Every structure is written in structure tokens, then in C-alpha cells.
Amino acid sequence: MSILIILIISIIFYLIFDFLYKNFSNRQFKGPLALPLVGSLLHLKDDTHLVFQNDSKLYKDGDNNGKIIKYWFCDQLTLAIYDTNTMKEIYLKNPESLNTRVKSPSTNVIGNRFRGIVTADENYWQFHRDILMKSFTGRKVKSLSSSIEKETIDLITYMKFIEKSGQSFSPRSNFMNFYSNIIFDYVFSRRIENIYEGVNEEQGKVLLAIRELFDYLADTLIVNYLIFTKPFYFLYLKMFGHPADSLKKILTKYYLEHSESIDLNNARDVLDSLIIEYRKVGGKEEQSSIIPMVNELILAGTETNSSTAEWFILTMVNNLDYQDKIYNELKSTLETTTAMIKLSNRNQTPLFNAALKEVLRLYPPVPFGVPRQVNQSFEINGGSLKIPKGTQIIQSLYSIFRDENYWDSPDQFKPERFLDQDSHSNNYFPYGIGVKNCIGMGFSQDELYISLSNLVLNFKLLPLIENSKICDKPIFGFSFKPNEFKINLEKRNN
């Protein structure tokens, strides 16, 4: 028998075994048919959020009642959680069993061997979270609101120029630059763009590097999940480079500048704080850990809030009656016509607060949460279900936030549902749940509150064509965002 025939027979046997294993193991969980090699990825390839939502209804007849559904991301067993009580049992009662991330070649390279914060494994996650929390509560944070206010004033000034010149306004590019400036000032004490002066060569490289990495992260690469391709793909990335490399080079330059000029008794920003905290424990792996940490802070701090701001603007344009109500509420809180909305006004703007919550419910920026991997098996549901070691756990937030069992008219924009502070609090967690929720939640909420409230206060946000609606069909990338759109601005006479 020739080697070729043996090889063909071996491949056929492997494909048969792979098909049987994926579909007949872990049978306590139901899920779609898994194909050899690719698993469930073809099932999920189009409008993934809607496929997940439909699956939650399709598999409601089993013991799990659609609460947990099994998928295979190539060779990676994945359980999607569709029920808030099940999610709380997993994340709140078993946090020690979810102490790591899925270790793919891409997360290995981005996290520099899993040393980041989003990509951190069980060896780094707790320490890195602790020192980041110290950085977020340090001296620099006290001036964060003033930084957001300054950037907001600059953006509004630019928007007034756009409105006066009769141009349309592009939320995507402007919000990306706006939120990038805030996070760069917070982390590095520098801006990356001045709206009026344009972008210099170095700033252009920063923006390009960020966008290239976003584009890469938008794709689910099969080679990240197939057992036999992982080592070869990792070797390829190390030999020929990764889209994260360009941004890492720039961040390394910023790190070295800070390292040389740092005052260990007076942190200027988050990067200084991280360096100081690492040197308190001897500085081991300082540079190799801090670079991926700030890299992930930049990505998360820019993309998710930029996407949320786009959804908020889209929703205001598509719901002009609510936009006017919110404007009247915001205007009534101000003592003078030249004042701006600040964090101190938050308790006086319940409708705006509810509208922002409702936008995050309808369009969660990370619709499946941040995946985690089970590092030790555990049982839930009174011991009737065992979550095996090595399983990837994802939260189907989009499905939960539109489940009619939890929400009245779940597909409609109804901010009134959040006017009662305790309403839906048990079923609403756009920033995650448990000790592993979003570390920058407060930062994000402050940014969104100051920036978006003042945009509505200063402008009537209108569609390009009168009485039309902007398409709210989302696209998937690093985050959940709308198709790119433009709007018209009409200056308010405050």
C-alpha cells in the first residue's frame, strides 16, 4: 500500500472520528451539528448575533431549556450562556475555575505570552488587575473629567465649524479620534491628533497602527482554533510579524521615554503608575508585561466607546422625539446658557442616563462578552451539569438583552424601562459580571456621559434625508458597531 493511500485513509478516519467526537461527546449540552475540522463556524458565519439568538429559541426543549448551548470553534469546545441565573452561577460562584483565557497564537502574540490584561492568563491576571486598579484610582484619575471636558469642547467647536460650512458629520472617524485622544492623554500624557492642525507623521502612524489591528481582530481565523495549525501559525507570526507589532513599536518608544524621565514619587499618568508598581516588586518582566497591558487599554478604551457613541447618535437620529425630550432635560439642568454638562449633573439627567443604558442594552459593544477558558472542571445546576476543563465560555449578551422573558418589547428603544433604578438590574450587565468585569467601567461611563450629553445639548442630530431612518444592522469587528453613516447637524440655540 503506497504512502499516499495510507495518508488518504488516515485523513478519512480522522475526519470521521472528529465528527463523531464533536457531536457525541458532552451530550448533556445541545447545539448545532459540528462539522469535521471547522466545527460550528459555518453555522455562525453570517449575522452571528442573530444565529445565537435563534439558537436560544431552537434549543429550549431540553434539560438546559436553552440556557447553555454547545458550539465548536474548530477544535475548541465552546459553551454559550443564554440565561442570567446560569451566568451568575458560573461567574460568581466559580470565579477560580475561570481564571484564564483561550490560548491562541494571536492572543499569545498580542499579550506577549499572555501578559496583558484582556489576554492575561492565570499567572498574570490578578496582579495586573490589581496594579491597574491602583493606577485608575491614582492622582491622574482626579483630573480625568477635566480632560474629557476639554476634548469635548474641542469636538463641539469642530462640529460647529462643520455645521456652519454645511458639511455632513461622520461619527466614526471623529469619535475614533476623540476617544483615542482621551485614552492617550490618560495613559501617556499625550494627544495623538489635533482636529484643527491635522495629523503629523508620527500621529498618523499611531492611528494607522490602531486601525490595522482593529481590522485584524475583526476576523475569526480558523488557524487560531485548529490544534494542528496553532504551532505553525504562531511560528509564522513570530517570523513574519503580526498586525500588533506596529503599535507595539510605538508604545515601546513611549515606555522608554517614560522610563527615562519618571519620578517614582509622582506619577504623571497610567504608564508611570504601572512602572512604579512593577518596580515595587523588583521590576521583573516590567517592559514585556507593561507594553501588552497598555496596548490592550488603548484598544478597549478606543473601540468600545467609539462604537457605543455611534449607536447612541444613530438611535437619537432615529428617535427624534426622545432626542428632544433629552435635550430639554439637559437644558433644564444648566444655570447659564454657556455652561456644559458635567459629571456633577448626572443625578439631574435621569432620561439621558436611561437612554444611554438602553443603547447599551440594544447594542452591547462586546455582544458575546470577553471569552474565558475553564482551567478546572466544575459543576452547576445542582450537580446535573459538568463544565469540562478547557472549555471556552462566552456570554450571549445580545440574546439575553433581547429576551422577551426579561424585557418588555425587547427590540424597541424604550429608555423608560430604566427610569426605575432597580428595574432590570439583575438582567443587565453590559460591562460583564463578577470579579472579571470590565476594569475600565467607570472610565467608560464618565467618557460617554460627558461627551454624548453635551453633543445632544449643542446640536440637533438629523438624518441626511428628512424623515428617513439610519440602518441599524450591525457589523462585527473587534466590537459591535453600525455600518458607517453620516448625519446633518443643526446648532441648538441654548
Curated annotation (Swiss-Prot):
Q: Where in the cell is it found?
A: Membrane
Annotated TM spans: 1-21
A Pfam family cross-referenced in the UniProt record is p450
The Enzyme Commission number assigned here is: 1.14.-.-
**Phosphoprotein recorded as keyword:** no
Q: How is this protein annotated for GO cellular component? A: membrane
User: Which InterPro entries does the annotation name?
Assistant: Cyt_P450, Cyt_P450_E_grp-I, Cyt_P450_sf, Cytochrome_P450_fam2
Keyword Signal applies: no
CDD domains assigned to the protein according to its UniProt record, in alphabetical order: CYP1_2-like
What name has this protein been given in UniProt? Answer: Probable cytochrome P450 518A1
Question: Which organism does this record belong to?
Answer: Dictyostelium discoideum
Q: What is the lineage of its organism?
A: Eukaryota, Amoebozoa, Evosea, Eumycetozoa, Dictyostelia
Gene name tied to this protein: cyp518A1
